[in-house]
Regions:
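Short amphipathic alpha-helical "recognition" segments used for binding
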Residues: 17-18, 387
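Short intrinsically disordered, low-complexity coil segments enriched in acidic
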Residues: 1-2, 94
């Protein structure tokens, strides 16, 4: 543990004093925070260990400890996996959690059933429930008050994405629930803050799944919020930087914004001091790698009971780290998976949208569950006949949108059987087809053939035109095969055929140039 502490301390950010120390009656607070864990079971097991360590360190310093989640703990329609997510909130002893859009990958009623018995407070100020209330409404609160060991009280508010309805597969899943738009959310936030202040609260924290740019706007428009534990846009916000995640409310008081990336790869520890007026007078924001910690044994045993012990399929000797923003770079796991699909399903090319990849696998023993955790959406695969012009258009469209959007969406197309080069402004300058014998052929990116056809495999999200990829929609005559499985099954079968131990590395098939 001493070695671990030395590593963590060495990676700590410099603390920033915001107000001069005029008195000694300051409240020390440490916030353990996470966001967008996306059902990553292996990461949850490590995050429980991280949460326990953070609590012990806070107690040593005499700090209050809060554990807060900004949403998207769940993902996909697998109820058992999402039940593990609910158990994670419970075992890690989260004080409160916001709901994200992926909590609604399942119906509101199922979500309510999974959350109903938790001690964790579920916050959703800008959700509107129909008159025939679903059970989720009985769990969700607009705000709550928690008391630290010091006796100090904290007001907590939670908000969901204002565009929630556009983030779900089917409207029926919401069972009549709607979310307020951004302007109404900001208006109601001010009203909710005012209510808490009337109750004597002067330390107010927002748990938000609105995304960084909206969260920054909230910080600058709503008076009385001290900290925003953010999520949804998957930003990795390290340290404290004025103008970025240290901004000022309309009355000129500091507001701290946090986010810890995505998929449970990182978590944050926000160390604060509040003065007697409830202003943040000292701040230190440490974003840490979850892999510093071993899986928590209790959580691991519970997972095995809930999901069953997962079969071992291989031994991973070495692996390239996934990019901090895997939407704008080649992903080593995407290389392995797309190559697996191309080999096992005998296609010329494979295309996978970057957002499909949720997490990675650590070195050592690899189980089926490790691979399944990467693909939570259960999007079945299709083999299709596609023209050169259509897949070139898809690659170019993704690149242009991704490199010119604030949130890097929809993400570059991950591929097998192809190599391509894209500029930082989103222009695709070169595409090369690489056949199964390794022979390369350059494609005219400015005039691709409409009459030359390839066999391609991609999933039902893309075949339905997801991410506005209408050029990838196929008529029945061009669908060569429908597979009753997603990418995880193919990848698991492929890994079993590899010489062990195996490695996962990028090979430069996607190049980014100035």
């Amino acid at each position: 543990m001493n070695v671990l502490n030395n590593i963590l301390v060495a990676n700590n950010q410099q603390p920033i004093p915001l107000y001069p120390a005029q008195n000694k009656n300051r409240t020390k607070t440490s916030i353990f925070y996470s966001n967008d864990v996306h059902g990553q079971v292996p990461k949850m097991q490590r995050l429980v260990s991280a949460a326990e360590h953070t609590e012990l360190e806070a107690q040593k310093k005499g700090s209050d400890i809060l554990k807060l989640s900004a949403g998207d703990t769940f993902i996909g329609s697998d109820e058992k996996r999402n039940a593990v997510g609910a158990t994670f909130l419970d075992i890690a002893d989260f004080d409160a959690a916001a709901l994200g859009n992926h909590e609604f990958d399942i119906t509101a009623s199922i979500c309510g059933n999974l959350l109903k018995d938790l001690d964790t407070k579920i916050l959703g100020m800008n959700l509107n429930f129909p008159s025939n209330k679903c059970n989720l409404s009985q769990k969700v609160m607009r705000s709550t008050i928690v008391e630290g060991d010091s006796g100090e009280k904290y007001g907590l508010i939670g908000v969901q994405p204002s565009d929630l309805e556009s983030r779900i597969k089917r409207k029926e899943i919401l069972e009549g629930i709607t979310s307020d738009d951004k302007e109404q959310t900001i208006k109601e936030l001010q009203e909710e803050v005012n209510k808490l202040k009337k109750q004597g609260l002067n330390k107010i924290i927002l748990l938000s799944h609105e995304g960084y740019h909206v969260e920054k706007e909230i910080a600058q428009k709503v008076d009385g919020i001290d900290v925003i534990i953010g999520g949804h846009s998957h930003d990795l916000i390290e340290g404290v930087e004025e103008g970025k995640n240290l901004v000022y409310s309309p009355s000129g008081e500091p507001v701290i914004i946090t986010q810890a990336g995505r998929d449970g790869n990182y978590y944050g520890v926000l160390n604060l001091e509040f003065d007697e007026q409830g202003r943040v007078s000292y701040v230190q924001n440490n974003v840490r790698d979850t892999n510093f910690f071993s899986p928590n044994l209790l959580m691991t045993n519970i997972v095995d009971k809930m999901l069953g012990k997962s079969p071992v399929i291989g031994n991973l000797q070495s692996v390239d780290p996934i990019p901090k923003n895997n939407l704008i770079e080649e992903n080593p796991w995407a290389d392995l998976v797309s190559d697996a699909i191309r080999t096992r399903l005998d296609a010329d090319i494979v295309m996978i949208n970057s957002a499909n990849f949720r997490g990675s696998v650590d070195k050592g023993t690899v189980t089926e569950r490790d691979i399944t955790s990467i693909f939570p959406f259960n999007n079945k695969l299709f083999k299709v006949r596609i023209s050169e012009a259509d897949f070139v258009s898809a690659i170019k469209t993704c690149a242009k949108k991704t490199m010119n959007s604030k949130n890097s969406k929809p993400g570059l197309m991950q591929v097998s059987g192809l190599e391509y080069t894209v500029t930082k402004s989103g222009d695709v300058t070169e595409i090369i087809f690489k056949d199964k014998q390794g022979n390369k052929q350059s494609i005219d990116v400015n005039n691709p053939s409409k009459d030359k056809f390839y066999t391609a495999v991609y999933d039902e999200f893309l075949i339905g035109g997801g991410d506005e990829m209408d050029m990838l929609k196929r008529e029945d005559k061009d669908i060569l095969e429908r597979y009753p499985f997603d990418k995880d099954k193919v990848t698991i079968d492929y890994i079993k055929t590899l010489k062990q131990p195996f490695s996962v590395h990028k090979d430069g098939r996607i190049k980014i140039i100035q």
